Amino acid sequence: MPSLDVVSTVDMQAMDNAVNNAKRDLGNRYDFKNSKYELELNRKDKAIEIVAEDEFKLKAVIETLIQQCVRFKLDSKCLDIADSHTVSLGAAKTEIKIKDGLTKETASKITKFIKSTKLKLDSAIQGEQIRITGKQIDDLQEIMRLLSEQDFDVPLQYVNMKR
């Protein structure tokens, strides 16, 4: 029986490259000359910490980071941007969590959606992935298209498609 796995993973090397390119771009920008900002990727916690002189510069750093993520083919849905707060001397700080893997809630939403499509498919949650099996490969391709059209707040990838 044909099957495929639905996962949500983030390439941390590509994320590291996006953060480094964002730092380089910000260093070349005229409005960031002689201003202090920090943009650090914590691979262990899968988080990005941003500190900037003010709220405007913080938003500019976030926008530059998102542009670089798109450039490296990372979906911006994988970034969970927290609200910013003020630290010493008016500086603004925020932390961006990187969503890696499917949560149980998201996985159950996806399986409910698959069941609601009335396609002849079976889905099973296996840790941080969902295994979808069906009798026809066309049904699997159709569910891939339908899942891509939906918004589950995480980027979805389809792996291990077996005929």
UniProtKB/Swiss-Prot annotation:
It holds the Pfam family DUF520. Gene3D superfamilies: 3.30.70.860, YajQ-like, domain 2. This is Nucleotide-binding protein DehaBAV1_1126. GO terms for cellular component: cytosol. SUPFAM superfamilies: YajQ-like. GO terms for molecular function: nucleotide binding. Nucleotide-binding protein. HAMAP family: YajQ. It comes from Dehalococcoides mccartyi (strain ATCC BAA-2100 / JCM 16839 / KCTC 5957 / BAV1). The lineage of its organism: Bacteria, Bacillati, Chloroflexota, Dehalococcoidia, Dehalococcoidales. Belongs to the YajQ family. Signal peptide: none annotated. InterPro entries: DUF520 (IPR007551), UPF0234-like_C (IPR035571), UPF0234_N (IPR035570), YajQ-like_sf (IPR036183). The keyword Nucleotide-binding applies. Keywords: Nucleotide-binding.
